[in-house]
């Protein structure tokens, strides 16, 4: 397999075509962004940490029956994924009130929700990735009702696997963002990444934040928190 032209560059990754028609080459960057790109910085080693953390999560989820686009690691910062067309919806699953949910509904951060809350956000940087409901999704033609139901079901299935998996490692899964894509034959796969960039991870004992909130809120020690996550997931830290 050969790396070919760059297809896309986002806030955290570059995507390249490969010599195989059904696979892409993904390169993770050290760029850190928050607030829809308004806050930016470089965090040495972040690309490698997120690449390896994502590989661990996706491999584990595939073993537990949740199919995804991950194929294999290529290098410290690169991986091969199956080619999918990304559905322009971010699926957010929340177990504990934090971030925008706490602010929007006037809830105290850290409040345990009686059941997981699933939210959909329209992937559009120009609009600020707005929160949308089923009617919005239908009117905008973003996804069919059937696909929307599949995304919600898969999001909750991921949650059911991740919560106990992380609890065993003394990590509380507060909330997380998922993206999904369709293969050429219409199969919906979990895609993008699962990392401290896309999840809120708290230490189960101290509630110390082990995720991008350390960057968002200027808490410091961002790289150290990401390293701690990789270590607890059983990965070796080389950064």
From Swiss-Prot:
The keyword Signal does not apply. Disulfide bonds: none annotated. Gene3D superfamilies: ATP-grasp fold, B domain (3.30.470.20), Phosphorylase Kinase, domain 1 (3.30.200.20). Pathway: Purine metabolism; IMP biosynthesis via de novo pathway; 5-amino-1-(5-phospho-D-ribosyl)imidazole-4-carboxamide from 5-amino-1-(5-phospho-D-ribosyl)imidazole-4-carboxylate: step 1/2. Keywords: ATP-binding, Ligase, Nucleotide-binding, Purine biosynthesis. It is an enzyme of class 6 (ligase). PROSITE patterns: SAICAR_SYNTHETASE_1, SAICAR_SYNTHETASE_2. Pfam families: SAICAR_synt (PF01259). One of its GO terms (biological process) is 'de novo' IMP biosynthetic process. This is Phosphoribosylaminoimidazole-succinocarboxamide synthase. It comes from Brevibacillus brevis (strain 47 / JCM 6285 / NBRC 100599).
